[in-house]
Amino acid sequence: MKKLLSLIIIGGALVAGCNSQTTQEKTSAIVKQNGVQEIVKPTLLTKQMFLDQIMDYETNPSEWIYKGDMPSLIDFYADWCRPCRITSPILEELAQEYAGKIKVYKVDVQAEQELAAVFGIQSIPSFLYIPKDDTPVMSSGIAQTPEATKDMFRKQIDEILLNKTN
């Protein structure tokens, strides 16, 4: 009986050890700025947050007036979408990499159907690149591999949001 109990305890410890990262570590990035560690991750947007922080399309339906203080990337996704699940950790890494330069947001198209309709989202994942002082650009889909997808995002962030040319 003692051997069985010991095996169960050791097995449980092994399983716990194989998954030692906490959910916080998996879903967020930590950036050190001015000696202070700050957690940077994509922000989940609701309709009201979008109206308050990005653009109030109810007040100004025919004119884009961006309310943000820096360029932004918005990921329109769904939990059941495989390409969206591939994209999610990539955007978390890029939120850390570009911290202080851009903001990364996520919109769940199932929960926020009005936002998806306003932007004509017909396929997911779709991405809205919002430069600080220019016209937003919409794109959709991902590349064939996660690495190529990350490179695609970097290129679009640099060119569209940060106005960098190679």
Describe each region flagged by the PLM:
Residues 1-51, 158-166:
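N-terminal targeting signals for export/organelle localization
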Residues 45-70:
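A short beta-strand-turn-helix
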Residues 69-72, 76-80, 123:
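Short pre-active-site segment immediately N-terminal to redox-active cysteine/selenocysteine motifs
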Residues 71, 113, 119-130:
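Structural micro-motif
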Residues 76-78, 87-95, 99-114, 121:
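Thiol-based oxidoreductase modules, predominantly thioredoxin-like and allied folds used
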Residues 79-86, 126:
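C-type cytochrome heme c attachment motif
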Residues 123, 128-166:
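Non-catalytic, surface beta->alpha helical segment in thiol-disulfide oxidoreductase systems
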